[in-house]
Amino acid sequence: MKPIMMMRKMGLAAMALLLLGGNAPAQTGGVRQGAAQKDAAQQYGPLRPGVPQRVDMQWWQDSHYGLFLHMGLYTVAGGEWKGKGGFGEFIQLNNKIPVAEMREEAKRFNPVQFDANEWVAAARRAGMKYIVMGSKHHEGFAMFDSPCNDFNVVKATPFGRDIIGELAAACQRQGMPFGVYYSLGRDWDDPDCPSNWPREGGRSNDWDYPNERAKEFSRYFERKAMPQVLELLRQYPNISILWFDTPGYCSPEQSQRMIDTIQKYRPGCLINDRVGNGLGDFITPEQTVSGGLDPDPWESCITIGSSWGYTKRDTVFKSPEIVARLLTDIVSKGGNLLLNIGPTPWGTFPEKAVANLDAVGRWLGTNGEAVYGTRPWRVYGESFVREKIGGKTGAENPDEVK
């Protein structure tokens, strides 16, 4: 694509945003601006310089917009435990819920309205081009049929269905690329998963397993993390992204072994930077947007509400205007937006979130040419390209470059 065409298309998208939202100044719904690269580097380390590109990322870089899904036992609690509040997916940590009680909570997990085909259809209506679904979050509960650990949706709940498997199949039927999230270094169900936060015991299960010094990450890695990743690769052949989190105590050798294993079973699969130790194919700033262009491929993961998992009291979702502004801002800097929804305990998406995303989808139906398949100009944030009489295109106003 010629750079001037990219600039014109982004100008048309910006004009459409004025019609959609009414106000010219950017609004970000509480998303932090300008700290993306720094934040990602502090948590996970920058990608190693000079490492050749491992896989073809063009489809992902053309997509620019994906759906992130967080669902687990925390969904049932909905941000409240025995009258006390707790932050969505962190309800177990916030309230120090014992493992035994979480296993009882699994008996209440029964999202009978779950329809994988409708989830994929909703993403398509929203203009999203790929889906990443949580397969295991920090509570250690697997959303797929895991032979190596019975604490999973098929064996431990009355629902008894493989949510990852059904969603993977629906994505394949509808031509939607599919990826899975996996919490690599944090597991509150496992006695060997130590804290990977700055302070000892900071985000590990120190109420059931108080002796941090007795915990051995390599035992957990060999017993659960590596076997479950292998299960995902073998059971769901259309996985195209493995989206790790909390690499924590992963050694360089363990991170590399994980990458080698994925490459063996799924050669084209993309891997994010949270596999740890400066490895991976793209960086993943969280709840932030880059302050400028980045030489590494990058993707901002951002919630549409206040938390990653479903919360009963979360009724304020980012408006269509804010989502569209975030998307165009990110695309103008060469990134992707992975927008998160927390499905309800019944297996549906919150109605207000769906309505807002449908509106963004309609906007993309008209303006998608300015988003999909684009690449950034040498600088971002230019104003409209000026058209001269006779059809000749004039240069942008240098005073209007941010």
List the predicted regions and their residue ranges.
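Bacterial N-terminal signal peptides that target proteins for export
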Residues: 1-12
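Bacterial N-terminal signal peptides
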Residues: 11-21
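Mature catalytic domains of secreted/periplasmic carbohydrate-active enzymes
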Residues: 27-402
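Residues at the start of alpha-helices and the adjacent loop-to-helix junctions
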Residues: 6-8, 18, 115, 163
